[in-house]
Amino acid sequence: MKQQAGIGILLALTTAICWGALPIAMKQVLEVMEPPTIVFYRFLMASIGLGAILAVKKRLPPLRVFRKPRWLILLAVATAGLFGNFILFSSSLQYLSPTASQVIGQLSPVGMMVASVFILKEKMRSTQVVGALMLLSGLVMFFNTSLVEIFTKLTDYTWGVIFGVGAATVWVSYGVAQKVLLRRLASPQILFLLYTLCTIALFPLAKPGVIAQLSHWQLACLIFCGLNTLVGYGALAEAMARWQAAQVSAIITLTPLFTLFFSDLLSLAWPDFFARPMLNLLGYLGAFVVVAGAMYSAIGHRIWGGLRKHTTVVSQPRAGE
């Protein structure tokens, strides 16, 4: 069990690192390529890669599962959610820094929590509410220098925030639908179907020929984005299979900090290619509060449960005392 937990930690960290680096690479490609085209290539590469892996393992999804309309509807909802999330997230990167986009993305777990209560009839814990409030407070701190602009003017920066919030919101529909689909299919099978369907849906919107205009560096970044999608989500699925979902979710919340770390590091090494995040001390602190809130929402109940259990064990009198 310890070995499985160790592997689960490494896989979850792999996902957080992949997702942390992703928007930095995408920002380079967005200088030439529009969001729908980038997302098209990401889904195409991920679909081919995951399809090949499942074919070798003889684990391609059985289509007989979708003979019932209910499962087809759920698949359509999940596809629309992932489609919208990828497009809106890429669009937000046109106006925001990679770190800002990832910090806003932490709203997704809060939305998933609310949706799980109303749609899946799950119980909301007090630690989840506290974590959500911490996260929202962290967002205010992170955007402290831009709050007036965001709420009073419809600037490019405001559009970036709107797209980012939209991406986090539509992701919830994907998350809820996938949670139900997992009763019939394994996570890699669901992802393969979603990648394939999203690739087909994006083809009319994409401009595949633009790839010829990319520099060697930008082409490398685009390939990295495609592989990142395959590895990031694949590692997440394997982590969930080997470790408890709450702990995996807690590690995934570190994603914005990896983005912040990579952005600072790359801007120092190659300032001509990578812009340094324009954050004051309160902004940096806000990023940490956002992550802490998301993490507390994911595992806060386990922390308090462990403390109560420890207190109970310690307070029990022994025989003869």
Swiss-Prot record:
Pfam families reported for this sequence: EamA
Cell membrane recorded as keyword: yes
Glycoprotein as UniProt keyword: no
Localization (cell): Cell inner membrane
Stretches assigned to the Cytoplasmic side: 1-5, 57-70, 121-130, 178-190, 238-249, 300-321
Chief location bin: membrane
Transmembrane residue ranges: 6-26, 36-56, 71-91, 100-120, 131-151, 157-177, 191-211, 217-237, 250-270, 279-299
Origin superkingdom: Bacteria
UniProt keyword list: Cell inner membrane, Cell membrane, Membrane, Repeat, Transmembrane, Transmembrane helix, Transport
Recorded topology in the membrane: Multi-pass membrane protein
Record's GO cellular component terms: membrane; plasma membrane
Similarity comment: Belongs to the EamA transporter family.
Protein name: Uncharacterized inner membrane transporter YhbE
Taxonomic source organism: Escherichia coli (strain K12)
Encoding gene per record: yhbE
